[in-house]
Regions:
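Well-ordered, non-membrane alpha-helical segments in soluble/globular domains
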Residues: 84-96, 181-189
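Helix-start (N-cap) segments at beta->loop->alpha junctions
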Residues: 240-251
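Extracytoplasmic/periplasmic ligand-binding sensor regions of membrane-associated signaling proteins
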Residues: 153-239
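Membrane-interface helix-start motif
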Residues: 18, 22-23, 249-257
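Juxtamembrane extracytoplasmic/periplasmic/luminal helical "stalk" adjacent to the first N-terminal
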Residues: 2-89, 106-108
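Conserved small/polar residues in nucleotide/adenosyl-binding loops
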Residues: 260-265
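Short regulatory alpha-helical segment in sensory/regulatory domains of signaling proteins that mediates
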Residues: 63, 92-105, 215, 254-258
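GAF sensory/regulatory domain recognition
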Residues: 114-173
Length: 265
């Protein structure tokens, strides 16, 4: 009986091989994987276009809050980037909305950088805030214990009661560290100072390629919008990041890709 089964198995294997069945099965498996990649790619594109890049409510809140603080004499657009102290009132007034945006859109980071100068005229350190949530899929902590502060003024850190990352700095250090401006900051800002009268902030949204925040191990790609006041003056950028580690969690292991080839909308 065993000999008969062995013979039948040998014949079956031979027929599959000579009939091209193995090749067909392999192709079918490849087609299934390819379709899963296409489906997941469509999912990611939908997230990028309709969720992660939906920052209009956040930018409106920042602009409205900034305008109110200016009218109260607590903030001056022309001096927002002078120091951490000049930017702190606005940061504290909008940080809850920044965190809310991170939560609702399930992103791994959110940031604001203030600036009032042409970035082509030299490197300067800039005030702002950068928050991280390395696991947006987990249940959010009511006290924000799952968040980390990457950049924020000391007074903001004290007020938020959120832990700082080991790479925390009170400012975005460009001149001090002698590093060029991050692309997610430089490109949308410079584009906006030349076009703020012709295009809205949303029109100038910018998907940036992968980068690492100085002294951070987390590689991420970004989406940024310029901050533009009622007079058309550009006073900073706001945006989100998606770490590549998190993106890999959204993809089954067979679909992990090289993000240097990721096509951004």
């Amino acid at each position: 009986m065993c000999i008969l089964v062995l013979i039948e198995t040998t014949i079956l294997v031979g027929s599959l091989s000579t009939g091209g069945m193995f090749a067909k099965l392999n192709q079918n498996a490849k087609d299934i994987v390819d379709q899963r990649v296409i489906n997941r790619s469509s999912y990611l594109q939908n997230e990028m276009l309709n969720n992660w890049s939906n920052l209009s409510q956040l930018t409106d809140h920042i602009n409205t809050t900034a305008k109110q603080l200016v009218s109260e004499g607590k903030v001056d657009y022309e001096h927002l980037d002078d120091s951490s102290e000049t930017a702190t009132p606005l940061i504290l007034a909008v940080v809850d909305q920044l965190i809310s945006t991170m939560r609702s859109q399930h992103v791994t980071g959110a940031y604001i950088i203030f600036n009032n100068h042409d970035l082509d005229k030299g490197l300067e350190d800039k005030p702002g805030i950068y928050l991280r949530d390395l696991d947006p899929l987990s249940k959010a902590s009511a006290e924000n214990g799952d968040l980390l502060i990457e950049r924020a003024p000391t007074e903001v850190v004290k007020s938020l009661n959120i832990a700082t990352d080991s790479s925390w700095r009170p400012r975005f250090e460009f001149k001090k560290a002698n590093i060029k401006y991050y692309d997610f900051f430089y490109t949308p800002y410079q584009q906006a100072i030349s076009n703020s009268q012709e295009f809205s902030s949303t029109d100038m949204g910018y998907w940036g390629g992968s980068f690492r925040l100085r002294d951070s191990e987390n590689e991420a790609f970004t989406y940024s919008l310029p901050l533009i006041n009622d007079q058309g003056a550009v006073y900073g950028v706001v945006g989100i990041d998606i770490t590549l580690d998190y993106l890999n969690k959204l993809l089954p292991s067979t679909e992990s890709v090289s993000y240097t080839h990721l096509t951004l909308p």
